[in-house]
Regions:
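Histidine-/acidic- and/or cysteine-rich, low-complexity loops and terminal segments associated
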Residues: 1-60, 117, 121-126, 148-169, ...
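Residue-level signature of transmembrane alpha-helical entry/exit and packing/kink sites
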Residues: 10-14, 47, 51-55, 90, ...
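Alpha-helical transmembrane segments
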Residues: 50-65, 127-143
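Juxtamembrane transmembrane-helix termini in multi-pass membrane transport proteins
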Residues: 56-99, 103
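A small-residue-rich subset of transmembrane alpha-helices
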Residues: 87-115, 189-223, 230-235
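Transmembrane alpha-helix/helix-exit interface in multi-pass inner-membrane proteins
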Residues: 103-121, 131-159
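Hydrophobic alpha-helical transmembrane segments in multi-pass integral membrane proteins
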Residues: 106-113, 185, 240-254
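Alpha-helical transmembrane segments of helical membrane proteins, especially in multi-pass transport
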Residues: 142-152, 174, 178-202
Length: 269
């Protein structure tokens, strides 16, 4: 009980950090005419240095907002174990190294966004320009939910006690290594879901929140493994729905065109 009380400041600090990041995202989206917000949505395939820095900062803030909540149980468990060993700075090292992994992912995301926008696969709002790309990303993320790698990484993320029993290292450097390892497991668990940001839009706060809830649910709720599979099924069904709409729409347009041609020929005759 004493440990729980001692962890209240840590919980408050983490939640305040998450809230701050969400408020920054909300500001960027609602005040899109602000010069900084405009830098995060490059209108040209040729980015300026300001665009590069702003987009990277946006991704870092978004990753903290999305991924830190699901890491809270692991951070609290490490804090509890570190306090028993009288090592007060280890928890900071663990958390920072975990976030470094998502900073690294943000670098990759910026490179991917720049490359995709340059080739016309993404628009300035970071949305896929064709439904085919969205379908591919949804199917890929849906199938990945059923893979062994996903299950292994999810299991490591869901069991803080088991993780530290298997990988515990003492000292600040040891905590840094454990945080990095946990971050890599988390990245292995969630990278495919993160790519879905390009389906609903990086600047779509509702979509970002939906993906965050999905990540938190599968990593922290008691039925997380089942939730993970249901997410996979839902993503595949969403891809099928979009694919059906795309095929049906094209078929209707084709039939409409044929009908127009027939009517024109009848009028001429």
């Amino acid at each position: 009980m004493i440990l729980v009380r001692n962890q209240i400041p840590l919980i408050a600090l983490v939640l305040c950090g998450v809230l701050f990041c969400w408020l920054v995202l909300f500001w960027l989206i609602t005040d899109s005419c602000h010069p900084i917000a405009m830098l995060t949505m490059p209108m040209s395939p040729v980015w300026t240095l300001g665009n590069l820095i702003a987009v990277f900062a946006m991704w870092v803030v978004m990753m903290i907002a999305m991924m830190l909540p699901s890491a809270l149980p692991m951070i609290l468990m490490h804090h509890r174990m570190a306090r028993k060993n009288n090592q007060s700075f280890e928890n900071i090292s663990f958390t920072i190294s975990y976030l470094f992994i998502w900073v690294f992912f943000s670098v990759l995301a910026v490179v991917l966004q720049f490359s995709a926008q340059k080739t016309g696969l993404l628009d300035p709002a970071s949305l896929t320009t064709t439904k085919i790309i969205s379908i591919i990303l949804l199917i890929m993320a849906g199938i990945y939910q059923f893979t062994e790698l996903k299950n292994t990484c999810l299991s490591k993320c869901r069991t803080p006690a088991g993780f530290f029993m298997g990988y515990w290292e003492s000292g600040v450097l040891g905590a840094f290594k454990m945080g990095t390892r946990h971050g890599l497991f988390c990245l292995g668990c969630c990278w495919a879901i993160m790519l879905l940001l390009f389906v609903g839009g990086v600047m779509n706060l509702t979509w970002v929140l939906i993906l965050t809830i999905a990540v938190v649910a599968e990593k922290t709720l008691p039925a997380g493994e089942l939730i993970s599979k249901l997410i996979g099924v839902g993503l595949i069904l969403a891809a099928a729905y979009i694919g059906y709409g795309l095929f049906y729409g094209e078929s209707m347009q084709s039939m409409s065109g044929m009908n127009m041609e027939c009517m024109a020929q009848m009028k001429m005759s």
